[in-house]
Amino acid sequence: MDNMNHEELNDQLLVRREKLHNLREQGIDPFGKRFERTNATNDLLSLYGEFSKEELEEKEISVSIAGRIMTKRGKGKAGFAHIQDLHGQVQIYVRKDAVGDEEYELFKTADLGDLVGIEGKVFKTNVGELSVKATGFTLLTKSLRPLPDKYHGLKDVEQRYRQRYLDLITSMESRETFVTRSKIIREMRRYLDDNGYLEVETPMMHAIAGGASARPFITHHNALDMELYMRIAIELHLKRLIVGGLEKVYEIGRVFRNEGVSTRHNPEFTMIELYEAYADYKDIMKLTENMVAHIAKQVLGTTTIQYGDYEINLEPEWTRLHMVDAIKEHSGADFWNPMSVEEARELAKEHNVEIKDTMEVGHIINEFFEQKVEDKLIQPTFIYGHPVEISPLAKKNDEDPRFTDRFELFIVAREHANAFTELNDPIDQKERFEAQLKEREQGNDEAHMMDDDYIEALEYGMPPTGGLGIGIDRLVMLLTNAPSIRDVLLFPAMRHKQD
């Protein structure tokens, strides 16, 4: 469609509307009724692809298929077309003497993009292409707009995202990506259900934006006359359920963060969060690597995948590396010995690590990791032992309380999961929230708000608990070799189209 000028496009629109008018004049419904299919295109290939031309002629197999006309050729009393459904394409052969004058005229005047139903016999052409010889041809939906150029598809990447329906029509690869996405989520559910987890649903609108460090979307409830926040995480409601005795829970759902758009970020995205009573972050590490490997095996048939230039091995057990050791390995800076914030700032200056004046030692450690280590983590790696300053909901490590029992999973230099042994001490939790409030006062609008109701829930007693969050969109990117998050979201966030 990029190659057409407006005049050509308008001509095509007019011609198709004239055809629509003619169909109605003839008493033919251009937007037809239910059509019963016996087979999808991939069924035909798997069931009959191995038969010879002669065997198919002898068997006289009758089928009924439906789909969109993608190619069409032929003149006179016979013609060929390719019909596309969700699973692929199959060729049809339409002869005037086989379908009759009226139906052949329908075929002759059909346009690329029209949706049709075909009844006929399976056969092979002289060059061996499995096809359907039509005995009936039904117009199901008249297409009033021409499809993008079949040889070039949608060249404009932005148009692919804005008009995803055209992308799905013209790109088999795109269709396969979204079918795979559905399978990934299905296998994730199956794995957790089979391991005794209970799927639950919790509110998407919260009185307090909690469970993550992020800027929320704010909305207003008219009847209650109160501000609400679209959830930035699922966490705190699920942990209330752990308090209530639901010992293994998970939720797959949308999360909203009022932040930038990039190849890795969309303002609304899909997460899974899960929590298990009487477990810790080490148990959750095992669960994570086993679940991701299971999904890869079931959906892709392998745990060795290609992402960009990298071959990634998802077979457990994955590398486990303390954040401080990772920093020492990749930069030489050693944070194991306790130090003052002035010493940490001097170290940052020495290693050209950019920091803000308000940062404490833990924040500086995290900046070292993000600037010196993160882009080196290609194979699956659990980075654990995050500083307490950046982990307000994680339990302190017993041996070194400067750090927490928390991990993040990195693959191809991207964070794919975040998990901890959950903080279940209500007094410590309140102190952490208060420290976060001070950060908000200093200008960090992503710092956690105080949540007194959650503190009260913890005061009733939450068992030792391991929790996990995985960004499903990024996992789908990894398993489908997609370079951008927009390639795995059916309708990604876009700016208003400029006229």
Swiss-Prot record:
Pfam families xref list: tRNA-synt_2 (PF00152), tRNA_anti-codon (PF01336)
Residues that bind Mg(2+) 1: E408, E415
Cofactor: Mg(2+)
Coiled coil: none
Family: Belongs to the class-II aminoacyl-tRNA synthetase family.
Gene Ontology process terms (BP): lysyl-tRNA aminoacylation
Keyword Oxidoreductase: no
Source domain of life: Bacteria
Protein name in UniProt: Lysine--tRNA ligase
Listed EC numbers: 6.1.1.6
GO cellular component term, pick one: cytosol
SUPFAM superfamilies referenced in this protein's UniProt entry, alphabetically: Class II aaRS and biotin synthetases (SSF55681), Nucleic acid-binding proteins (SSF50249)
Reaction(s) the record says it catalyses: tRNA(Lys) + L-lysine + ATP = L-lysyl-tRNA(Lys) + AMP + diphosphate
An example molecular function term from Gene Ontology annotations: lysine-tRNA ligase activity
Localization per Swiss-Prot or TrEMBL: Cytoplasm
Subunit structure of this chain's protein: Homodimer.
Keywords linked to the UniProt accession: Aminoacyl-tRNA synthetase, ATP-binding, Cytoplasm, Ligase, Magnesium, Metal-binding, Nucleotide-binding, Protein biosynthesis
Cofactor binding summary note: Binds 3 Mg(2+) ions per subunit.
Positions annotated to bind Mg(2+) 2: E415
